[in-house]
Amino acid sequence: MSNTWDDVWASDSDVETERSPDLVKLRENHSKRGYLDGIVSSKEEKLQEGFNDGFPTGAKLGKQVGIIMGILLGLRTRFGDEDEDLSKAYIDAQKELRINKVLSKSIFDPNFDLQEKHPLITKWTDIANTYCEKYHVPSIQ
């Protein structure tokens, strides 16, 4: 004779518990959450690695752009009223040396390394140096 109080926690009906809709849904949610956490964690690690690898290159290019723009602005401030070409060159440099153009994917190899000298930096360094020579100002090294 079976006593109804023998198994108050209903542990003998494991099969029914495993098929409970609430538990199935809970298991699915935990599984999805674990999957998403794994994806997010992986992306964060790769993003950080990419940032760590690319930051020195971006910082170097940014510094070079800053030097070019600083020299052109200084020359334009001093000589721009009498030199229309210099004023135009400064405006063109502002357009061409925007961050999205300097760091364009097309300039880098698949590993995001520069193959050679950066074409925009080289172009504008030469232009700035031409104006430096014209106005007897130390050029960009």
Swiss-Prot record:
Q: Which UniProt keywords apply?
A: Cytoplasm, Nucleus
Its annotated compartments are: Cytoplasm; Nucleus
Gene Ontology cellular-component terms for this entry are: cytoplasm; nucleus; Yae1-Lto1 complex
The ranges of region (deca-GX3 motif) come to: 34-74
Q: Which InterPro entries match?
A: Essential_protein_Yae1_N, Yae1-like
What the entry lists under Pfam families is as follows:
Yae1_N
Q: Which GO terms describe its biological process?
A: protein maturation
Family label: Belongs to the YAE1 family.
Quaternary data: Forms a complex with LTO1; the complex bridges the interaction between the CIA complex and RLI1. Interacts with RLI1.
Other remarks in the entry: Present with 1500 molecules/cell in log phase SD medium.
Its job: The complex LTO1:YAE1 functions as a target specific adapter that recruits apo-RLI1 to the cytosolic iron-sulfur protein assembly (CIA) complex machinery.
This chain's protein is named Protein YAE1
Q: Which gene encodes it?
A: YAE1
